[in-house]
Amino acid sequence: DVSGPVIDLQPLQETEMDELLHKLRHVQAYGEAKNYLIDDMGLWQFMLQCRTIYGAQYYLNPRLAIKTLLDLLAILQQNPNAKVAELISEIS
């Protein structure tokens, strides 16, 4: 629907993307750091993998990284014995 007002959003900067993904992890853990399914190092590896796979789209369209992170967290929640590094390496 383009009949209404349109907001022209600038691509997210690297620090903004980092903050967004950290906050999504925090929300998924119900605001409790002890419930994080992926630690800071794992989240950093996730971001590097996304940058490699998505390239410029990683910043232009954050939906890709958001959906991928939420999918990864759902898999980790359903499979507590899953290895984070292995799952991240399988992201494509």
Indicate where each model-derived feature is located.
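C-terminal alpha-helical "lid" subdomain
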Residues: S3-S92
